[in-house]
Amino acid sequence: MSKPVIAIVGRPNVGKSTIFNRIVGERVAIVEDRPGVTRDRIYSHGEWLNREFNVIDTGGIEIGDEPLLVQMRAQAELAIKEADVIIFIVNGREGVTAADQEVAKLLFRSKKPVVLGVNKIDHPDMQEELYEFYSLGIGDPIPISGAHGLGLGDLLDACVEHFPEDEGDDYDEDTIRISLIGRPNVGKSSLVNAMLGEERVIVSNIPGTTRDAIDTAFSRDDQEYVLIDTAGMRKRGKVYESTEKYSVLRSLKAIERSDVVLVVLNGEEGIIEQDKKIAGYAHEAGRAIIIVVNKWDAVEKDDKTLHRFQQKIRDEFQFLDYAPVLFVSAKTKQRLQHVLPAVKKVSENHNLRVPTHVLNDLVMDAVAMNPTPTDHGKRLKINYVTQVAVGPPTFVFFVNDPELMHFSYARFLENRLRDTFEFEGTPIKIIARKKND
């Protein structure tokens, strides 16, 4: 199930970014220790009343015919289209402006739930400033202060009331859900069409749980698959595709509903920062991952080209060192026959369980090979380890002091797990917990 999406809209300089930062709080900070994982700070996650959601800051909506204003407005409309709930921010000190009225008309036409936040109400004496905003026809204005963090609980309470019901995908648990993600023009839709055409399979289009998403179900060699949000890959227009944060928004919804993510790169153009950002979202979500280099037929090659590109991927995607790499061409069907077998394999690895006794024997051998670290004379002691989850495989190490589990030693333990078991294509989570917890 994809998380609900809140879009924050309003004219420029009403405090949208401040509200955004208040809602997401420290979640904007990067918590991944490995190099290369970056996050677009215009887009982040939040949680309120035990409901997780995604939130996006749209930038200011201005009325005018200048090309930049037209593009900004179009981008905001796209965010509104993707949102489940809209927070409309206005400036309580300036009152209702003509621009506010135009934004209100835009929101009214969208027929989406709208929560009206009147910002910069920094003192109880300013409550009377609210009444004017009833004229926008949006509903009850909620007084807030982004600067002081006032009223945000009421704002989020109202948003949660409009969240859609938490419904899961109605697919059999043995069905492998696949999403293709990547920046514009890497050939995602061409890959989808080539994969479906190549396999000569029975194909059916199924409405996804995300609004206007269409999933494509098919089977191959007695394995059921679903390609998530194929409509999203095919329908985007130029404005949508040229705006990183909105294509990322759609990709994140697809990632959340997937078991396996194909990170698609353009072999002709090489690797850019946006590729790393998009791949980072799949890694952070804990999905099984395959890196697919498309358009390989168009690359001029010598006998070292493949090796150089592989090394470039390993250098740029150090946080995806577990992901297999496939070089394919949607146009010529080159190596496409390897994609689905790789998907099936990494899905199996993503759900692999290791018996507890085997796990503990491995850890004892690892500690004998490389003793646990010490800090100020105190040594980390691993009492025992158990696997608590799959998808991704998650291991809890019960220790004397979790603070002593340095990142480098956790990495060593992960590498020992990978050397021993089939974990290609899947991230691994290692959690240190005090023995008595």
From Swiss-Prot:
Q: Which PROSITE patterns match?
A: G_ENGA (PS51712)
Q: Write out the GO biological process terms.
A: ribosome biogenesis
Q: Which sites bind GTP 2?
A: 182-189, 229-233, 294-297
One Pfam annotation reads: MMR_HSR1
Q: Keyword GTP-binding on this protein?
A: yes
Q: Which UniProt keywords apply?
A: GTP-binding, Nucleotide-binding, Repeat, Ribosome biogenesis
Task: Tell me one GO molecular function of this protein.
Answer: GTP binding
KH-like domain residues are 352-436
Presence of the UniProt keyword Nucleus in the record: no
Residues reported in the UniProt entry to bind GTP 1: 10-17, 57-61, 119-122
What are the EngA-type G domain coordinates in residue numbering?
Answer: 4-167, 176-351
Subunit: Associates with the 50S ribosomal subunit.
**HAMAP family referenced in this protein's UniProt entry, alphabetically:** GTPase_Der (MF_00195)
The family assignment reads: Belongs to the TRAFAC class TrmE-Era-EngA-EngB-Septin-like GTPase superfamily. EngA (Der) GTPase family.
Explain the purpose of this protein. Answer: GTPase that plays an essential role in the late steps of ribosome biogenesis.
Please give the name of this protein.
GTPase Der
